């Protein structure tokens, strides 16, 4: 199975993934105050350490009125440092990270 094309690197535009496995978005409910948390960071680092090529942070609202659930991520300038922390930590594990906007 390890000889499968699934485990070979792949490029998406300028991004090269270490393999073709991608953790799809599934609502984590790990964003108290609608901001990234240590729990969210640890979760995605664990997924990355497990070997996926890319993990996806789920269901981020782009406006406050777009929030559907408690503990849902809300995209705004003040959360950028927290997202940067997650991104850096996931990259350190060798994976890429994406985000689902909704």
List where the protein language model places each region.
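Flavin-dependent oxidoreductase catalytic cores
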Residues: 1-102
């Amino acid at each position: 199975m390890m000889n499968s094309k699934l485990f070979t690197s792949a490029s998406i535009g300028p991004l090269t993934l270490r393999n073709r496995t991608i953790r799809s978005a599934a609502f984590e409910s790990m964003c108290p105050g609608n901001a990234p948390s240590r729990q969210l960071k640890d979760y995605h680092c664990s997924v990355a350490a497990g070997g996926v090529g890319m993990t996806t942070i789920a269901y981020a609202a782009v406006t406050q009125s777009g929030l559907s659930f408690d503990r849902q991520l809300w995209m705004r300038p003040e959360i950028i440092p927290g997202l940067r922390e997650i991104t850096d930590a996931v990259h350190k594990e060798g994976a890429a990270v994406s985000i689902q906007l909704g």
